[in-house]
Amino acid sequence: MQVRVRLLLLLCAVLLGSAAASSDEETNQDESLDSKGALPTDGSVKDHTTGKVVLLARDLLILKDSEVESLLQDEEESSKSQEEVSVTEDISFLDSPNPSSKTYEELKRVRKPVLTAIEGTAHGEPCHFPFLFLDKEYDECTSDGREDGRLWCATTYDYKTDEKWGFCETEEDAAKRRQMQEAEAIYQSGMKILNGSTRKNQKREAYRYLQKAAGMNHTKALERVSYALLFGDYLTQNIQAAKEMFEKLTEEGSPKGQTGLGFLYASGLGVNSSQAKALVYYTFGALGGNLIAHMVLGYRYWAGIGVLQSCESALTHYRLVANHVASDISLTGGSVVQRIRLPDEVENPGMNSGMLEEDLIQYYQFLAEKGDVQAQVGLGQLHLHGGRGVEQNHQRAFDYFNLAANAGNSHAMAFLGKMYSEGSDIVPQSNETALHYFKKAADMGNPVGQSGLGMAYLYGRGVQVNYDLALKYFQKAAEQGWVDGQLQLGSMYYNGIGVKRDYKQALKYFNLASQGGHILAFYNLAQMHASGTGVMRSCHTAVELFKNVCERGRWSERLMTAYNSYKDDDYNAAVVQYLLLAEQGYEVAQSNAAFILDQREATIVGENETYPRALLHWNRAASQGYTVARIKLGDYHFYGFGTDVDYETAFIHYRLASEQQHSAQAMFNLGYMHEKGLGIKQDIHLAKRFYDMAAEASPDAQVPVFLALCKLGVVYFLQYIREANIRDLFTQLDMDQLLGPEWDLYLMTIIALLLGTVIAYRQRQHQDIPVPRPPGPRPAPPQQEGPPEQQPPQ
């Protein structure tokens, strides 16, 4: 009975609200409220009659869910048929297509009204509620602005259930929402193809999806497409289009867009170079959490580029990035990136760059298929980590390791254990299987298996935690030089797990592991030097170690992408990728970008800007200790490439390369400058000294040094002649006193010996000429055999 009364009161409130809203709508037609505003207060609806009625209805109907359900259940048991009629009448104000055809069970699914009035729903501005009622979206609220429809939306909106949909949105907002939902679906389709394919044509198809989503202002798609246009990744390189997208993303507050725009201003691509603007955009990108922007700022503060040099500021940025890189390190170690310097590769074509030729890879594959265990293990490791021209492929790695493990190879067993312990899309994670392989490998004395078994006991993976056994197996692995064992031993001593805390021992094992190239070893050493734990605090050392960790992040894969672009003669794409990596502080990228610009192979940079930008990056690479870059700086100042001719500055760079890196080329150049007196006072003796040093420093320099010394001897003789008075010399010269009274006999003897040597040489040369022999008789031509004579028949 109580429910009946409340429903009747609701009907009265609705009818009064409908009439009041009609009159109010005529006089307040231009009024509107924010469609996404918060819940209204009493003050915000005091001037709206319908709002008052809604609040009145709310006060009458607010009950706890349990109370309403109890009352409804009682009423159902007493008079089910009467309640059906009552409910049907009470909701007859709904302007749905066929309300009378809905059954009672469907009507029971109507949300219990919380009657939360939403600001603006009782006014003339259309609104839209993106949730379903009776399996339909209530577009009646948006189409003709009916007061009863809007009132129903306001009084049946369940805040707790429907807050995820937002509040009331206008038609324009609803259209944007539907567009973004469509764009998100297109973006996800493109990313699915992109992540699940390895073929270029499939990746190009994926970027077509992403371009379509980007055209619908999908932020993540815009970020992907903008960088693809910048680098020419599966799309035609278009710096101007990338710039426009970066500007659009920057307006929306995208950290990736801000970082991209900062890069364009830093490198002067598509815009006038401005280091001040670059610094501003990099800073905003870093504040938004972009790790590349943090790396750029870390390097700039470390090297003092555009900012005051500050080791502590560099430490802050590098440590933040290093924390993310260290957290992403997997048990298998992740992918390996090959760093190849283009200047070294061109200067020394025979130098081993570390890349495997396709023919050699096929040869190893042939051996592996024939059962060569070492080839199987080697290919498994290559595919597990990638690098050296081989793409990372866990399926192939697993197959090769499985073949070798079945043949009894302990190394393959240990790596199978690592793959099972880590888990992937190819190999399901299984502590039991990993433990099985680790034990088999460890029993055979394999350090990888011993280290894996130690990890199992340390963290309780498939076994009970046992620090003593973990320490035992790590020590065995470390004694054999395995970096994982050394790293874990250092961690146990650092944290005092299973052993007494000992920072000196931790430092010892971290240093050993870092010599093997383990990323986490560099990270732990950086933490110790940054905080002064176990060592004297050193900001400079900590920054260098953190920088090393940061440069092994996932973005380092761009190095190989840029190298492949260069090998494919796509110099514009290569130089842009190297330039971005150079901004992040990669020395190899700085030298490679400078080399491409030096060779004038990239047309994306104007001719007048080529040498100045190359000089900039040679300078940055030289400051990080690259010898060739330091010599190039001397060459640029010597010849005036990208700057004025400055022999003194050139001499300084050559001397630095000679003293710090013991470069034979720099020593030779110093000898030449001393010989000519360029940038320094002429000194023949110092010139000879540097020439001799160059010959000792490199065997390749011996031939040019010999020629230079011959020339230097002639120069020295001519200089002596110029300085001496020849006429006075001969008048004062007494040959009898110098060579003795028979000096003329000595001279004649020497001339005779020389003449005899020449005659003997000529005779031997004449005897060595072969005497032509008369041609012998030619052999008779072979007689052609005719057809056999036919025997007469007998």
Swiss-Prot record:
Regions of compositional bias (Acidic residues) in chain numbering: 23-32
Domain Fibronectin type-II: 122-170
Stretches of the chain found on the membrane's Lumenal side: 22-738
Protein family membership: Belongs to the sel-1 family.
Sel1-like repeats: 183-218, 219-254, 255-290, 291-326, 373-409, 410-446, 447-482, 483-518, 519-554, 627-662, 664-699
Keyword Ribonucleoprotein: no
Physiological role: Plays a role in the endoplasmic reticulum quality control (ERQC) system also called ER-associated degradation (ERAD) involved in ubiquitin-dependent degradation of misfolded endoplasmic reticulum proteins. Enhances SYVN1 stability. Plays a role in LPL maturation and secretion. Required for normal differentiation of the pancreas epithelium, and for normal exocrine function and survival of pancreatic cells. May play a role in Notch signaling.
Superkingdom in the source lineage: Eukaryota
InterPro entries per record: FN_type2_dom (IPR000562), FN_type2_sf (IPR036943), Kringle-like (IPR013806), Sel1-like (IPR006597), Sel1_AlgK (IPR050767), TPR-like_helical_dom_sf (IPR011990)
Subunit structure: Homodimer and homooligomer. May form a complex with ERLEC1, HSPA5, OS9, and SYVN1. Interacts with FOXRED2 and EDEM1. Interacts with LPL and LMF1; may stabilize the complex formed by LPL and LMF1 and thereby promote the export of LPL dimers. Component of the HRD1 complex, which comprises at least SYNV1/HRD1, DERL1/2, FAM8A1, HERPUD1/HERP, OS9, SEL1L and UBE2J1. SYNV1 assembles with SEL1L and FAM8A1 through its transmembrane domains, but interaction with its cytoplasmic domain is required to confer stability to FAM8A1 and enhance recruitment of HERPUD1. The interaction with SYNV1/HRD1 is direct.
GO BP of this protein: ERAD pathway; Notch signaling pathway; protein secretion; response to endoplasmic reticulum stress; retrograde protein transport, ER to cytosol; triglyceride metabolic process
Region (Mediates retention in the endoplasmic reticulum): 738-794
Organism field: Rattus norvegicus
Post-translational changes noted in the entry: N-glycosylated.
Leader peptide range in chain numbering: 1-21
UniProt-listed SMART domains: FN2, SEL1
Membrane topology (Cytoplasmic): 760-794
Location of this chain's protein in the cell: Endoplasmic reticulum membrane
Region (Interaction with ERLEC1, OS9 and SYVN1): 22-737
Entry keyword Ribosomal protein: no
Region feature (Disordered): 23-46, 73-105, 767-794
Protein name in UniProt: Protein sel-1 homolog 1
Annotated gene: Sel1l
